[in-house]
């Protein structure tokens, strides 16, 4: 491959990172929509690839916890999408439904986080630091905890908020190092 061809590809990738997919008239809306769509695509890809992995592992008779063949096959495996077994249209419907649900969750998290960090940066006079990341991570973590199941306890919400704040703050602090 020529060096100029490699440069063109890298320039395209860099321009994709800077360009927004939508122009909704306000930078906040553009950022939320852009983050939502990109993360939803990643979430859908992750959900489908995870289910493909479990389908291959189950079809080959391997235990997903060990590398080799299982000594004893148990029915207690925990799959994220338990209705995805067989070759029926019901199985495909379950895959589409669950992939959509997961991509919506990923998009919600990214859009919410991106919108909160943008809003906090604007409110704080252009300061984008670990405080913005901590607040956005905490609110996003709490929102994600509330969307994952119907019976979410307040302890789970608090734990998810703290985890979101910690991960977001660490990512912000480490981004200046690397």
UniProtKB/Swiss-Prot annotation:
Membrane topology reported for the UniProt record:
Multi-pass membrane protein
Tell where it localizes. Plastid, Chloroplast outer membrane
Gene Ontology biological process terms from the UniProt entry = monoatomic ion transport
Let me know which tissues express this protein, per UniProt.
Answer: Detected in pollen and seeds. Present in leaves and cotyledons.
Its induction note reads: Regulated by ABI3 and ABI5.
Q: Which GO terms describe its cellular component?
A: chloroplast outer membrane; plastid outer membrane; pore complex
Q: Which residues cross the membrane?
A: 103-119
Where do the record's region annotations for Contains beta strands lie?
Answer: 1-102
- The protein's predominant localisation is plastid
Keyword annotations for this protein, in alphabetical order, are:
Chloroplast, Ion transport, Membrane, Plastid, Plastid outer membrane, Porin, Transmembrane, Transmembrane beta strand, Transmembrane helix, Transport
- UniProt GO MF annotations: amino acid transmembrane transporter activity; porin activity; protein homodimerization activity
State if Transmembrane helix is listed as a keyword. yes
What function does this protein fulfil?
Answer: Voltage-dependent high-conductance channel with a slight cation-selectivity; selective for amino acids but excludes triosephosphates or uncharged sugars. Non-essential amino acid-selective channel protein and translocation pore for NADPH:protochlorophyllide oxidoreductase A (PORA) and possibly PORB.
Give the record's family classification. Answer: Belongs to the Tim17/Tim22/Tim23 family. Plastid outer envelope porin OEP16 (TC 1.B.30) subfamily.
Q: What is its quaternary makeup? A: Homodimer and oligomers in membrane.
Name listed for the protein in its UniProt record: Outer envelope pore protein 16-2, chloroplastic
Query: What is the species listed in this Swiss-Prot or TrEMBL entry?
Result: Arabidopsis thaliana (Mouse-ear cress)
